[in-house]
């Protein structure tokens, strides 16, 4: 009778476990999020994950490729170049619809902020994922989406944002306020981004596609002609100001060399690197030590 009772109890536990689901570990591989919008219905959007060996849960590091990019190829290259970083984070590489991210007038009209938020929410449920201190990094068009996520998201999972060769554009900040994209991509609603974050921007002094000094791009279209940008140093100051800096904009770098000028606010919690000899290839000047140093920063404000 005792054996039968134990057997029934075991069966009951199995049934309960099956009904509520057993917490699982995230593993390396490809995953999808299903979304519908004007261009697609029930469309499976891909992202790729690299999970390092770790005895403790690790935070997420999400990378967004530039226009025309490929997430799987980005993962191979980025993890090879940044091996120490790839041991400290669960690395995620999301694929943009039509190799694009929906900013102003790009090919993609997809709900991309919601896509990134869905990835974070989904992966945070795994036992080997730390739900806090997530990092969102993007290059060019991907960096523009990083800015938009930083502007609009209400998810508090992110602690660090990294934007490479795309400071704020003039639709995202009109000189007075940060702007939500809106369903029609008209950027008319003023919003207040979450505070207490860290932000790193890297821009090329000779960039013509995303002009360092601001103004219209020579190649990126917008609804009213060419996409205009905020001055890169001004853009960094606007973020620093929002995140708690109360002083005047820096007019001189805090560190300088022939290769790179550094503008540091809030003890490095908000930092801008001006690559003096580079253009839209400024991301090539970003080293793993630079990333690791920034990711060790915190913003208590």
Language model: regions and residue ranges:
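Bacterial N-terminal signal peptides that target proteins for export
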Residues: 1-9
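The feature captures the conserved acid-bearing segment of alpha/beta-hydrolase catalytic domains
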Residues: 159-160, 166-248, 264-265
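Alpha/beta-hydrolase active-site loop
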Residues: 106-127
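A domain-start/cap signature at the N-terminus of enzymes
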Residues: 21-60, 89, 108, 132-162, ...
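Bacterial N-terminal signal peptides
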Residues: 9-18
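C-terminal catalytic-base region of ester-bond hydrolases, centering on the histidine
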Residues: 215-301
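Acidic beta-to-alpha connecting loop that harbors the catalytic carboxylate
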Residues: 67, 97, 205-208, 213-216, ...
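Short substrate-entry loop that stabilizes the transition state in hydrolases
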Residues: 55-101, 169-173
């Amino acid at each position: 009778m005792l054996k039968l009772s134990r057997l029934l109890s075991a069966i009951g536990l199995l049934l309960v476990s099956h009904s509520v689901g057993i917490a699982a570990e995230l593993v390396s591989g490809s995953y999808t999020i299903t979304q519908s919008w004007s261009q697609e219905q029930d469309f499976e959007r891909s992202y790729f994950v690299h999970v390092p060996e770790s005895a403790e849960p690790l935070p997420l590091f999400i990378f967004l490729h530039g226009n025309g990019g490929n997430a799987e190829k980005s993962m191979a290259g980025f993890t090879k170049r940044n091996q120490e970083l790839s041991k400290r984070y669960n690395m995620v590489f999301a694929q943009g619809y039509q190799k694009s991210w929906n900013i102003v007038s790009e090919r993609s009209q997809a709900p991309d902020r919601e896509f990134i938020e869905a990835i974070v929410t989904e992966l945070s449920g795994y036992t080997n994922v730390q739900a806090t201190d997530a990092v969102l990094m993007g290059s060019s068009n991907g960096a523009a989406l990083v800015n938009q996520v930083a502007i609009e998201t209400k998810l508090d999972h992110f602690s660090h944002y990294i934007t490479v060769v795309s400071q704020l554009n003039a639709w995202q900040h009109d000189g007075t306020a940060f702007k939500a994209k809106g369903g029609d991509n008209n950027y008319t609603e003023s919003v207040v981004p979450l505070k207490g974050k860290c932000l790193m921007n890297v821009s090329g002094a000779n960039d013509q596609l995303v002009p360092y000094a601001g103004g219209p791009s020579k190649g990126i279209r917008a609804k009213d002609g060419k996409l205009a940008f905020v001055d890169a140093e001004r853009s960094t100051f606007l973020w620093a100001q929002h995140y708690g800096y109360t002083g005047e904009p820096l007019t001189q770098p805090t560190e300088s060399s022939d290769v790179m000028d550094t503008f540091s606010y809030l003890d490095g919690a908000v930092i801008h690197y001006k690559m003096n000899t580079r253009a839209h290839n400024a991301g090539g000047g970003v080293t793993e030590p630079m990333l690791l140093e920034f990711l060790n920063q915190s913003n208590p404000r």
